[in-house]
A protein has these predicted regions:
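Structured beta-strand/loop patches that form or line metal/cofactor-binding pockets in enzymes
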Residues: 1-47, 51-53
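Flexible C-terminal active-site loop/helix
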Residues: 2-7, 12-16, 28, 297-363
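Conserved, mostly hydrophobic/aromatic
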Residues: 4, 43, 68, 107, ...
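Metal- or metallocofactor-binding catalytic centers and their adjacent structured scaffolds
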Residues: 6, 39-118
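Metal-dependent enolase-superfamily TIM-barrel catalytic cores that perform enediolate-based chemistry
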Residues: 125-240
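Shared catalytic-loop signature of beta/alpha-barrel
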Residues: 212, 218, 229-339
């Protein structure tokens, strides 16, 4: 057994190529990337990370530095799940989600990376090893695009090798959403898988009304139609429409996921290892999803989630997100025959190119 001796944490503010807009989060001009490296007594280290939509990253960085680093120093690095559980309780009073879940996620991912490297096992293998690839869709943050630009953008995803796409909905006037959905379906043809994401911008009544209008366009799922913690509201929407529901990116604790499984009548769950508690929590959610007969999917950070989703027997879809974290790694996501391919190397397989990143180092 080797002990944790130190954490080194870095904060980066990474620009996007253009302003991206959805229904609830405002304008995205950049995203924040917080990377933490956990070192053990042998001098080996694992790398973990989390990200934000542009706000809160400095608070996450501070929590890692001030609260988590001294707490886990001296713990047995191999006891990854134990460290996760203890850190959750350590921060429970001020945490139970939010910033603490982001910070805990980064450390947990680093410890899994270290575990894999020391045991010569890939994350794919450690997470279950069911398959080496998974279905993937390209999701845009495109609510602010004109309709012609939206169609052009979605068409470019097909040129990149995807056979599934997702667009944002949630305009104040539902007729605008309907027109855009219709235009995209016409552009991509009847065979391409098509999802829509409202970023919880509708009420229950509005979501039901919108979904009934979307049904004409063969929508694979309706994502986050209403606020994520209205678990019974999801059930009300689900029983009234003929489109499957998906959500999970804004659930930050195992208890929230359990409520969603028990109450919300979802067909797809979308945990994000960057904010639900890391790989440990993501795998616990995956286990719950099998118990409740729900397909396990992901949100964001495709370079990591490709291993987790591929490894599951009930794998759904990998989201390929508009925040291109993998652009700053030595292995951007790979597609072969419309499928995303998991890396086959010890650890998580995510290795950052700090030469690229250091230009944006804000700490």
């Amino acid at each position: 057994m080797t002990k944790v001796v130190k954490l080194e944490t870095h904060y980066f503010k990474l620009p996007l190529d253009e302003i991206l807009i959805d229904a609830k989060h405002g304008n995205h001009s950049h995203f924040e990337l917080i990377i933490t490296q956990v070192f053990d007594q042998d001098g080996e280290f694992g790398t973990g990370y989390t990200y934000t939509g542009g706000r809160g990253g400095k608070a996450i960085y501070s929590m890692l530095q001030e609260d988590i680093a001294p707490f886990i120093q001296g713990m047995q690095a191999e006891k990854v799940e134990h460290i996760y559980d203890e850190t959750q309780w350590h921060l429970h009073y001020v945490g139970r989600g939010g910033i603490s879940s982001f910070a805990i996620s980064a450390v947990d991912i680093a410890l899994w990376d270290l575990r894999g490297k020391k045991n010569n096992k890939s994350l794919l293998t450690m997470a279950g090893g069911n398959n080496v690839s998974c279905k993937a869709y390209r999701g845009g943050i495109d609510l602010g695009y004109s309709q012609p630009k939206l169609v052009e953008s979605v068409s470019s995803y097909l040129d990149e090798g995807f056979n599934a796409v997702k667009i944002k909905v949630g305009h104040p006037d539902l007729s605008t959403d309907i027109s855009r959905v219709q235009a995209v379906r016409h552009a991509i043809g009847p065979e391409t898988v098509f999802m829509v994401d409202a970023n919880y911008s509708y009420s229950v009544k509005q979501a039901i009304n919108a979904a009934k209008r979307f049904e004409d366009y063969n929508i694979h799922w309706f994502e986050e139609p209403i606020i994520p913690d209205d678990f019974m509201g999801y059930a009300d929407v689900s029983k009234s429409i003929n489109i499957p529901l998906a959500m999970g990116e804004n659930l930050h604790t195992e208890q929230e996921f359990l409520h969603a499984f028990q109450m919300s009548n979802l067909k797809f769950i979308q945990p994000d290892a960057s904010n639900c508690g890391g790989i440990t929590a993501w795998l616990r959610v995956a286990e719950m999803s099998r118990e409740y007969g729900v397909s396990i999917c992901s949100h964001g950070m495709q370079e990591l989630h490709v291993s987790l989703v591929s490894a599951q027997a009930n794998a759904g879809w990998l989201e390929v997100h508009s925040f291109p974290i993998d652009k700053y790694t030595f292995r951007p996501l790979k597609l072969e025959s419309k499928l995303a391919i998991a890396p086959n190397k010890p650890g998580t397989g995510v290795e950052f190119d700090f030469e690229k990143l250091n230009f944006y180092n804000a700490t």
